[in-house]
């Protein structure tokens, strides 16, 4: 089991880097920046992710009277947005990939400055090093994305050849990562039963989906992407802060459990959206 746990960081690295490279090879800089010109949509995305979700997490914690450590884990996820898995969810759901990438980058950059400012207000004793968060997100996500975009712009033939390989690597590493997380954390998930932690994860995910959908504007694609993007939190940033700041292991366990619960719900929803679109050409979200 210890060996499997050690394989998770390496598998995560392969998944994130290969996914970001493949995304860059599939898009142009103009396609990524275009959705961000819609100032109203950008403001609504920031409202959903950095106002509604942090205070939503805080409210769920109080409503369910969670153990303090479990509540801290939930609030950590509420303040951490910009997940590398969002573009993959958008691909599965067959929705607007360019907006998904643009939203991911926007939320990730804001998270770097947002968490150190807001967490001490919501959690007593919390302190966050923005440099450590920024370093991991820039090196693992922004840099590979930039390399892919540059290669797409300068070497289109090579980019077209490399992208299918990276797509396969990304898909296989995602499957492996999901299995590893569940196998190595199964006992931790069981320990959460009876604490209302799993219920909190379900409520948190449903709240995020609803907030993103309602604030996503008139376009069906933007509503779907913002719903998925608001519900899929930045697990890496939440784990980084949880491990460095809090001594109680239940904080990290709660982050993992809520992330796993949310991932299952979002994968099912994304697959349903894709199947519905394939059958009718219309997505019901």
Q: What is each model feature region?
A:
Residues 1-285:
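Alpha-helical transmembrane segments of multi-pass small-molecule/ion transporters
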């Amino acid at each position: 089991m210890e060996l499997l746990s050690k394989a998770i960081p390496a598998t995560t690295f392969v998944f994130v880097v290969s996914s970001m490279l493949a995304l860059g090879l599939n898009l142009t800089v103009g396609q990524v920046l275009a959705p961000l010109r819609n100032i109203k949509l950008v403001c609504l995305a920031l409202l959903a992710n950095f106002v509604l979700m942090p205070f939503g997490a805080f409210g769920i914690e109080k409503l369910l009277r969670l153990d303090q450590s479990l509540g801290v884990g939930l609030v950590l996820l509420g303040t951490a947005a910009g997940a590398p898995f969002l573009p993959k969810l958008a691909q599965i759901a067959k929705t607007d990939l360019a907006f998904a990438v643009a939203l991911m980058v926007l939320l990730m950059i804001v998270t770097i400055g947002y968490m150190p400012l807001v967490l001490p207000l919501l959690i007593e004793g919390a302190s966050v090093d923005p440099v450590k968060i920024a370093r991991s997100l820039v090196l693992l996500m922004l840099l590979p994305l930039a390399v892919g975009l540059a290669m797409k712009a300068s070497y289109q033939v090579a980019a077209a050849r490399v992208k299918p390989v990276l797509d396969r690597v990304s898909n296989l590493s995602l499957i492996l990562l999901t299995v590893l997380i569940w196998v190595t954390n199964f006992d931790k998930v069981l320990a959460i039963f009876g604490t209302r932690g799993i219920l909190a994860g379900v409520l948190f995910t449903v709240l995020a989906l609803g907030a993103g959908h309602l604030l996503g504007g008139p376009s069906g694609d933007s509503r779907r992407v913002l719903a998925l993007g608001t519900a899929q939190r930045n697990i890496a940033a939440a784990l980084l802060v949880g491990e460095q700041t809090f001594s109680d292991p239940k904080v990290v366990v709660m982050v993992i459990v809520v992330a796993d619960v949310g991932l299952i719900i979002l994968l099912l929803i994304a697959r349903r959206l894709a199947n519905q679109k394939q059958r009718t050409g219309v997505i019901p979200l």
